[in-house]
Amino acid sequence: MSDLKINKKFAEKYEKYRQKEELQRLKDRYGDQEEENSSNSSESDSDDSEVELDPKLDRDFYRTLSLLKKKDPKIYQKDAKFYTEETSGSGSDEQPSTSKQSEKPMFLKDYERKVILERGGKYEDDDSADEEISAKMQERAASPTYIQEQKEIQESLRKFVQDSDDEDSDGDGQFLTRRTKTQEEKDKEEADYVEWLKGQTELDEKEELKDMKYLRDYWNNPQLDEKESFLRDFMLNKGYMEEEDEERIPTYNELMQDDVDDSEDEGESFLHKQEDFERHYNFRFEEPDAGKVKTYPRNIATSVRSKDDRRKRKREEVKERKEKEKEQKQQQLKELKNLKRAEIMDKLKKLQELTGNEQLAFNDVDLDGDFDPQQHDQLMQKVFGDEYYEENEEEKPQFEGDEEFEENWNWDTWVGKQQNEEEYDHKEDYTAEEHYQPNCDDPDFIMDADYDPSQQAVSKKKRKKEREEKKKKSKEDVPLMGKKRKKSHFAEIISKSKPVFDPNEKSFEQYLDEYYKLDFEDIIDDLPCRFRYREVVANDFGLSTDEILNAGDKELNRWCSLRKTCMYRSEREELCDLKNFQIKARNVKKKQQVFVSLFNENDGQEEQKDTKGKVGKKRRDRLKKAELTEKSDTTVTEETAEPPPAEQADVQDLKATIANDEEEDDEEFLVPKKKMKTAETVVTKRKEADVERTEKPKRPRKKMRRSGGRRLLKSMTVKMAGREFSRQRLQAYGLNPKRLHFRELYRQKRKEREKQEKQQKKSKQ
């Protein structure tokens, strides 16, 4: 068959026919597009001329308005210019951000119409794309290499620099140019400027903003008039610009202007438009965006937010006032502390005079520092301890030269001279000095015959020196010097006037306590607050220092938790814990269970020593049977009888548990079987160890058992909570009947003892 051929002429004619048909159909539907474009362009030009604004012109307007509101003297100057010349020319060069150009969106039909009108309905085919790719490849092959391009760029840069230098020399050219701001940056600056006028942001103070500061303060005044506030909102929000009403309800003619085609796309678009129209019409009286949650108040009084920081300023004033009051209180407490310190120093001086110790242990440093209870106790113990009060109390002081006082006077009962006696002694001394005549019995009497008494009397200093020299001489020379002096040093000290003891006066310790109480950490509600120390009962928790140091942390926590040692409790609770831990410390078995590491070391050493004296298995079984028989015999005895020595450890455990559980109910007597078994195993192991230590254990003697002993054991009952239970029944539940029996026995004894004590108390009353 021959190849198929296409008639190209017929194809071209048919294609032209289809294009004309499509063009006519579009014209019938949309009308003449050229006329509409011309009319629309004229309308848009008129709208743009109305909307276009200049931001510099707005700033000049705000500046002049601020000067007018302020009544600045610049207004009355003849040469004052409120609008710069640049604003007139800048409006044509730069388009403001606020101007909105009405640009019609392009749809698919518009694009097809454009292709039909401009290109005759021809689209770019694959052949043309291949041709473009081949052309690009040819251009790339003819282009220079990378090195050649770099050289060309360097040469062009050199030429440009040389030309720019020549132009700079002439004064016309400029190598560096000012960077032009983008439209986004300009819009952002304009928005910041408007927000600054609204009072919502702060900007750097520039010369341009100084003149407009008054206008900003005027508009942000909360007491602004309604008319002025309306003018402010109208100017700042640019209410004079007409905005497109997006939610405008279209008319019926606008909706039905386009004919509905049979195609699915146009039918769907018509349905969407119909639904939108119905929705807008039905909800025309409701608020827009009613389904969204508003993050701002619905009814805004003014669009410009005014700062209302009255509460903040009030809080700051209150805070400052409280800080000042706190400082005044601290200053007053410091002054009080200084006065108290001066009072204590006066007391110290008096103590130095009375005690004769001029170097006491207290200094200014001790009083200036912070209060330390341990240091305070050490100082008080050092100065006023047992040594201070016990000093010179072992023997009564004796003076050799005071015979006249020792014979007839008891100085221990001396209270002090009264006022009349002191005046009499003073007068007597004064008269004696006036009518003094030398006597041979006086110690200062001169035996020289050539001595002239009319000469000047000896000075007091010389007399003191002579007395000191006489004291230095030995006792053998004393009788040769004549009679002793009348008054000794002790008598002079006693004769001095001293303050009588006042029981109402505070002690030195009380003064120090008051001084240290003036210290404080903080002042809360005009009250100085300080940390108070608290006395706590000393408690070792039933452990020695070696046990505490050698035991592990887990073992110590099992004995007594760390939380319990740090609890804040009353003195009564502390004493109860002290008593309980003392009882707990006596239980050696409990300690062995808790402190395993301590007792394992001792047991290991003893086992190494006693490895020779081990007992065989058969003998151990015999000893166990003998012990069991002894236990069964002792249980048949009366209830008042004491438990056998083999069960002393078990009884001690019961005592400890009963002492801690005195308030436990009688019904809570059931003990788990596992605990019973562990207690019995510990007792048996202990007995085995005692037996193993003996090299040749003696076989225990068999005691005469009563007939029917086992029957008696089985038939014996245990009373618990007012009921009787057989031993077999308790054993069936996994309980130890012996343990329960002794527990009830000790409870009865305790009750009887309490009754006897009550009766004794009543009898004493």
Swiss-Prot record:
Residues 20-32, 101-123, 149-162, 181-191, 305-334, 424-436, 466-478, 624-633, 683-697 have a biased composition (Basic and acidic residues). Residues 20-56, 82-192, 292-334, 387-484, 603-648, 662-711, 746-765 are annotated as: Disordered. GO terms for cellular component: 90S preribosome; nucleolus. GO terms for biological process: definitive hemopoiesis; endonucleolytic cleavage in ITS1 to separate SSU-rRNA from 5.8S rRNA and LSU-rRNA from tricistronic rRNA transcript (SSU-rRNA, 5.8S rRNA, LSU-rRNA); ribosome biogenesis. Residues 85-100 have a biased composition (Polar residues). Pfam families: Kri1, Kri1_C. Belongs to the KRI1 family. This is Protein KRI1 homolog. The gene is kri1.
